[in-house]
Structure formats: structure tokens, C-alpha cells
A protein has these predicted regions:
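Conserved donor-binding/catalytic core segment of Leloir-type glycosyltransferases
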Residues: 3-23, 29-33
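Nucleotide-activated donor-binding/catalytic signature segment of Leloir-type glycosyltransferases, i.e.
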Residues: 45-68
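Short acidic/histidine- and often glycine-rich active-site loop of Leloir-type glycosyltransferases
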Residues: 52, 108-122
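Conserved acidic donor-binding segment of nucleotide-sugar-dependent glycosyltransferases
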Residues: 63, 117, 121-128, 136-143
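Short alpha-helical donor nucleotide-sugar binding micro-motif in glycosyltransferases
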Residues: 72-77, 165
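Aromatic "clamp/platform" in nucleotide-sugar-dependent glycosyltransferases that forms part
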Residues: 85
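Short hydrophobic beta-strand element within catalytic cores of glycosyltransferases
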Residues: 102-105
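A charged, aromatic-enriched C-terminal amphipathic alpha-helix characteristic of glycosyltransferases
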Residues: 143-171
Length: 173
């Protein structure tokens, strides 16, 4: 899997630019209450308004400097979670997979089509308990490996930014 753990904690990553209820901001707050101290939640793409909404045990990153920095953040994650309620196509899912990180997402929009049985878990829309269970299963059972995630992402290589993420992943130190 991606980078995995920091100080014996599983890293659960969320990335969006324009966080809202539609993107699952409330789900992140719920998961922060439900997951044990073995998990560290990191949310990228926040702003001051979002920071006020998030619990204190969530790490907030406003913006990344560039795609390389974002790819580095992806590779530190044990799992990428996408609680979106409406998504045309889950490009953030592909970005995570390209960095070797398995994905948990709701069955909504194009997000489920990004995954296969070797790269992540799809849960029913708004099933926060199901998302929590999938996160725990991925982290504790180590059921997905980064090679399978990258292979899945390669099926989408015609999409913008795909090749850049693969190269950044290959060249990481």
C-alpha cells in the first residue's frame, strides 16, 4: 500500500478542492468520531471555513504547492477515502490508485467504475458505518497492494495528470 503508517497510526486521506456536504465533509466529521486513535485522518483542499467544521483530531491541509507535493501526500496514506455524494468521475480516486493507495468510496456517480476487486471497496451512498468498516478492513487486513492499485490506475492512463502521477510515484525517494 502507499506509505502506510506514521507513529503506528493508519493514515486515512481525503482530497477535494471545494469541500462541502456534497463532497462528504460531514462524513469525515463522523468518521473522526468513529475511528480509534490508531487512525489519523488527513484532509487536503480545506480552507478556514472547513477547518471550523472539522474535529480537532483531523489534520487539515489547505492547498498543495503542486502535483508533486500532492502525490507525496497520497503516498503517505494507508487508504484513500472518497465520501462524495455526487461525482461525475472520481479523478481523485485515480490519483490515489496511481500512487499505490487503495480506495474506499460511495456508490455514486463515476466513483465505483474507478475501482475493481483488487484496488478498493465501494460502499452504498451515505453508509458511514460501511465506509468505516471498509477503512478498518483495508488498514488492518492489508488486503490490497500498491501494484494492483497502480495496475488499475493504468487502465485510465489517457486521462489528464495520470502519467504525471505515475512518474512522481516512480521517482519518489
Amino acid at each position: 500500500m502507499g506509505g502506510g503508517q506514521v507513529k503506528n497510526k493508519y493514515i486515512v486521506l481525503f482530497v477535494s478542492f471545494g469541500w462541502s456536504i456534497y463532497k462528504g465533509l460531514d462524513v469525515i466529521a463522523e468518521l473522526a468520531k468513529m475511528l480509534t486513535n490508531d487512525y489519523r485522518i488527513v484532509v487536503v483542499g480545506t480552507d478556514n471555513y472547513v477547518d471550523e467544521f472539522l474535529p480537532n483530531n483531523v489534520i487539515s491541509i489547505h492547498r498543495t504547492q503542486n502535483q508533486k507535493q500532492l502525490a507525496e501526500i497520497y503516498t503517505t496514506a494507508t487508504v484513500f477515502a472518497n465520501p462524495t455524494r455526487e461525482e461525475m468521475f472520481g479523478m481523485v480516486n485515480i490519483e490515489a490508485l496511481a500512487c499505490g493507495v487503495p480506495v474506499v468510496t460511495f456508490r455514486t456517480g463515476g466513483s465505483p467504475e474507478c475501482l475493481d476487486s483488487k484496488s478498493g471497496i465501494v460502499v452504498e451512498k451515505d453508509d458511514v458505518d460501511g465506509m468505516k468498516d471498509a477503512i478498518v478492513e483495508i488498514c488492518e487486513r492489508k488486503m490490497f497492494n500498491e501494484i494492483n492499485c497502480i495496475k488499475r490506475a493504468q487502465q485510465f492512463k489517457g486521462l489528464d495528470k495520470f502519467n504525471e502521477y505515475i512518474e512522481l510515484y516512480k521517482n519518489r525517494e
